[in-house]
Amino acid sequence: MEGQRWLPLEANPEVTNQFLKQLGLHPNWQFVDVYGMDPELLSMVPRPVCAVLLLFPITEKYEVFRTEEEEKIKSQGQDVTSSVYFMKQTISNACGTIGLIHAIANNKDKMHFESGSTLKKFLEESVSMSPEERARYLENYDAIRVTHETSAHEGQTEAPSIDEKVDLHFIALVHVDGHLYELDGRKPFPINHGETSDETLLEDAIEVCKKFMERDPDELRFNAIALSAA
């Protein structure tokens, strides 16, 4: 993924909510922390939830799994509804912004946008593009890039230098047409994780998150945030 490189975003609801506000999203939906994966802690997350973002480490084990998963889907096929908004990632460290775009784009009907919203404009202009075209469009979309850069400096930890290699990655988990989709711009296509509903999205998404953790039991660097009705 040579070429453009952005500063990474934190998996921090304050940062993501401020970022989306600056892009013209009305705060009727807000990101909140998911403090744990067990039912008691999940019950603390305000409902309804329309998306979950997972931050996880890219490890050797994960990369082996990713390659195997891709080959399996290419040989066996999978059902993916044409309603899914999916884009590729061509900008290093832009996975946080792409995760947010995936979360909002696939819940656009639930969202309220301020007049002149940059994000609404981007989504409307890219709606009929291919995943690759959307990636290239983002590369040249200065209004989002500048807002991302500002937000990357607003986290609780100091932003790394632009050249520092970052091995943490964001994906979005969303409900589209009755199915749970994993949207990861590093992958060639969305991953269909089976049936879900608006009511069970959080629990179903967390089951997928648990599989990421089980694949790397020695890793602690996992963080999930949920997009909840405010």
Swiss-Prot record:
Record-marked site positions (Important for enzyme activity): D184
Biological process terms in GO annotation: post-translational protein modification; protein catabolic process; protein deubiquitination; protein ubiquitination; ubiquitin-dependent protein catabolic process
Listed Pfam families: Peptidase_C12 (PF01088)
Subcellular location as annotated: Cytoplasm
Keyword Transmembrane listed: no
Tissue-wise expression: Highly expressed in heart, skeletal muscle, and testis.
Catalytic activity: Thiol-dependent hydrolysis of ester, thioester, amide, peptide and isopeptide bonds formed by the C-terminal Gly of ubiquitin (a 76-residue protein attached to proteins as an intracellular targeting signal)
Superkingdom: Eukaryota
Stretches the record annotates as Interaction with ubiquitin. Crossover loop which restricts access of large ubiquitin adducts to the active site: 152-159
Matches recorded under SUPFAM superfamilies: Cysteine proteinases
Gene3D superfamilies the record matches: Peptidase C12, ubiquitin carboxyl-terminal hydrolase (3.40.532.10)
Gene Ontology cellular-component annotations: cytoplasm; cytosol; Golgi apparatus; nucleoplasm
GO molecular function annotations of the record: cysteine-type deubiquitinase activity; deNEDDylase activity; peptidase activity; ubiquitin binding
Region Interaction with ubiquitin: start-end pairs: 8-13, 219-224
Role description: Deubiquitinating enzyme (DUB) that controls levels of cellular ubiquitin through processing of ubiquitin precursors and ubiquitinated proteins. Thiol protease that recognizes and hydrolyzes a peptide bond at the C-terminal glycine of either ubiquitin or NEDD8. Has a 10-fold preference for Arg and Lys at position P3'', and exhibits a preference towards 'Lys-48'-linked ubiquitin chains. Deubiquitinates ENAC in apical compartments, thereby regulating apical membrane recycling.
Family: Belongs to the peptidase C12 family.
Name used for this protein in its record: Ubiquitin carboxyl-terminal hydrolase isozyme L3
Upper lineage: Eukaryota, Metazoa, Chordata, Craniata, Vertebrata
